[in-house]
Design a protein with these regions (language model features):
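Alpha-helical transmembrane segments within multi-pass membrane transporters and channels
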Residues: 58-102, 109, 242-247, 278-279
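Short, non-helical or kinked segments that cap or interrupt transmembrane helices
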Residues: 25-46, 89-94, 164, 185, ...
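Helix-loop-helix "hairpin" substructures at the membrane interface of multi-pass membrane proteins
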Residues: 14-15, 136-214, 237-243
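Membrane-embedded helix boundary and interhelical linker motif in transport proteins
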Residues: 31-77
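Transmembrane helix-bundle core of multi-pass membrane transporters
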Residues: 85-86, 90-161, 188, 253, ...
Length: 291
């Protein structure tokens, strides 16, 4: 029972990271019906920039807002270069290829700056586990869960309580109507991409002390977060959290009780089932568009 609880704790921490990254997918989808397929590389850049700052002597807690600011700039750059031109000419696939290409470029740049070897990110908290309900849990895992929740709550608060956030919601509800009301929907979309990459960079800096940090770390995490977004629903924040936790726990328990070689299988099976029987996601709403 103790081992199972530990696996659940680790799975929840991993799942919340997936959820934060998937939350970034949701932000861009809501405003522009597009996704940043380089989201995993935004996470990687956040982790690598964070590692560089920590190695330079910057305090971990001061490093986090710097990483978020870096993510904002990186995300805005992706939207301006790769997405805005595709939206302007109403290209169905241009933004897909552009975000993938930019993700590859960021990965190659990271390899040239930091090398291809994985690096150890020093933990800001003690590495000795704590006892919780009879099982061990790492302090860093607790920080990951708390940090992920705070980030998503902060973004939701911004969307609901600020004027610019309400512009984001209006653009999501009806982009054409928002434009007629004088809302600069292009700027809103740019900001949604900036916020998306900022959340991914923040997630990268949080998860880095629990794993090895390197130029390739974002590819798998980004792909799994995309699966979480599809499983939970791209229109549901709650669905993304639930989907992330389900996938995280499924991976940790499968890896321990069966084999690490099969830890990705449950999530992929669930993804296929959701796509087959509820394409809008477990908590998502089916969109109906007039043509």
């Amino acid at each position: 029972m103790e081992i199972l609880l530990q696996l659940i704790y680790s799975g929840i921490a991993l799942g919340m990271i997936y959820a934060v990254i998937a939350f970034g997918y949701q932000l861009t989808f809501q405003t522009s019906d597009t996704l940043n397929f380089g989201q995993g590389d935004a996470l990687m850049l956040g982790a690598m920039v964070g590692l560089t700052l920590v190695n330079m002597g910057v305090n971990f807690w001061l490093m986090l807002p710097i990483v978020i600011a870096f993510g904002l700039v990186q995300g805005a750059l992706v939207e301006r270069i790769g997405v805005a031109p595709a939206i302007k000419i109403k290209s169905e696939f241009g933004w897909i290829m552009s975000t993938i290409a930019l993700g590859i470029i960021f990965k190659n740049v990271a390899e040239n700056i930091w090398g291809r070897d994985d690096l150890k990110f020093p933990s800001p908290l003690p590495e000795a586990p704590l006892k919780f309900l009879g099982a061990n849990v790492l302090p860093m895992e607790i920080l990951v869960v708390v940090g992920a929740i705070l980030m998503m709550v902060a973004v939701e608060f911004f969307n609901r309580k600020t004027i610019y956030g309400k512009a984001v919601v209006a653009t999501f509800n009806d982009r054409d109507a928002a434009k007629l009301m004088g809302i600069n929907t292009g700027l809103v979309i740019t900001f949604s991409y900036a916020l998306s990459s900022a959340t991914a960079g923040f997630a990268g800096a949080l998860i880095a002390p629990l794993t090895l940090t390197g130029a390739t770390m974002g590819a798998v995490l980004g792909l799994k977060a995309f699966a979480v977004a599809i499983i939970g629903g791209l229109t549901s924040g709650l669905g993304i959290i639930v989907g992330g936790i389900i996938l995280g726990i499924a991976e940790t328990t499968t890896g321990f009780y069966i084999s690490t070689g099969y830890k990705d299988v449950p999530g992929l099976v669930l993804l296929l089932l959701v796509l087959a029987f509820k394409p809008s996601g477990l908590f998502g709403k089916l969109a109906i568009k007039k043509v």
